[in-house]
Regions:
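Catalytic cores of nucleic-acid ligases and guanylyltransferases
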Residues: 1-163
Length: 163
């Protein structure tokens, strides 16, 4: 039987563990350093100035959660809508941002973060950078590179606000 996990090398598939989807998971946080570094297998990503958001999708239910465990569905209904139609159950991690020109702007996002009427506010985008859980499997044993491979396969970035 073919599964989405077949794109991983066999030794990585063997490390996956079946697990019920948790109600919460602590997001990994970046560590600031003054030292310059470079390693062949390291991944460098652009720093986005927005609101960290974990998305929990199970069936047709989507919960958008801040890193402080605050539900954000009401503030970002277009993100919720873009994730509802996805095929797989998952927990993904990303950043919700607003733009001022070509640059992400936290100050432009702030009114939207506390809005009671998000339809009247600025357009937002969800930049997804990690997948933590997929279809009944905890992915924490996988490298970030392998998780990103699964992320590209599991999440269809066809909705304009999901990137």
């Amino acid at each position: 039987m073919n599964t989405i996990f077949d794109i991983l090398p066999q030794e990585n598939r063997e490390t996956l563990h079946k697990k019920d989807q948790p109600d919460w998971t602590v997001p990994m946080l970046a560590t600031l350093t003054d030292k310059r570094f470079s390693k062949e297998n390291w991944i460098y990503e652009r720093k986005l100035d927005g609101e960290r958001c974990l998305a929990f999708k199970k069936g047709q239910e989507v919960r958008l959660m801040s890193r402080n465990r605050k539900k954000k569905n009401h503030q970002y209904p277009e993100i919720e809508k873009g994730l509802k139609g996805q095929e797989h159950d998952f927990i993904i991690d990303g950043e919700i941002v607003a733009f001022d020109g070509n640059v992400t702007s936290f100050s432009k996002l702030q009114p939207r973060m506390h809005s009671k009427d998000p339809d009247m506010e600025v357009e937002v985008f969800y930049y997804v950078f990690d997948i933590i859980y997929l279809n009944g499997h905890d992915l924490s044993s996988l490298s970030l590179k392998n998780r990103k491979t699964l992320l590209k396969k599991a999440v269809h970035f066809r909705h304009d606000n999901i990137r």
